[in-house]
Amino acid sequence: MAFSIQSIFSNIFSGLSADFKKKNFSLYGQWVGIISILLCLALGVANIFHASIVIVFSIICIVQGLVVTLVEMPFLLKICPFTETFTNFIKNFDANWPRCGFYLLNAAIQWVSIAVMATSLIVVACFFTVAGGCYALAAITHQEYLKSSIQVTGSPDSVEGQIGQHVVRNVL
């Protein structure tokens, strides 16, 4: 019993619109962070072919993308075997202020890359800055830290959702 692509995209976009209707900056930060993951991986690989010290920042960018993936999608910590120390380190970012600091530190690292050469890594720095700003606004306005409400497998009441959750439970 396979999921249709249409139902998956329908669930994603309905969850996305529900998240934006909540007007919570931590959700905005999470979505900007997810976009940052894609940008980190794509632009990190694209800039790795420079014949200068930019290669170092490209490698850092790829690593940042992988770490942000684990921060924004913590279920991957259960799937992938990591040390307890690393897992606890990632779990420290389950609040607005720590995530704000995490993203702003990542942004600062990528902003430093401009000193070497202006490359497309500036886009990653901008997105990290925006994500950090969203988490900072959430913390300043005392909004609670929320996670996205997207259910890729469907709502728990639907047959697809129940099957999807059962499959995920069996995998974990």
From Swiss-Prot:
Task: Tell me where the transmembrane regions lie.
Answer: 25-45, 48-68, 100-116, 123-140
How does the UniProt record describe the way this protein sits in the membrane? Multi-pass membrane protein
Q: Which UniProt keywords apply?
A: Glycoprotein, Golgi apparatus, Membrane, Transmembrane, Transmembrane helix
Chief localisation class: Golgi
Q: Which GO terms describe its biological process?
A: vesicle-mediated transport
Entry GO CC? Golgi membrane
Glycosylation positions in this chain: 24
UniProt-annotated location(s): Golgi apparatus membrane
Name the InterPro entries on file. Answer: TVP18/Ca-channel_flower (IPR019365)
**Family classification:** Belongs to the TVP18 family.
Instruction: Sum up the protein's function in the record's words.
Output: Golgi membrane protein involved in vesicular trafficking.
Name of protein: Golgi apparatus membrane protein TVP18
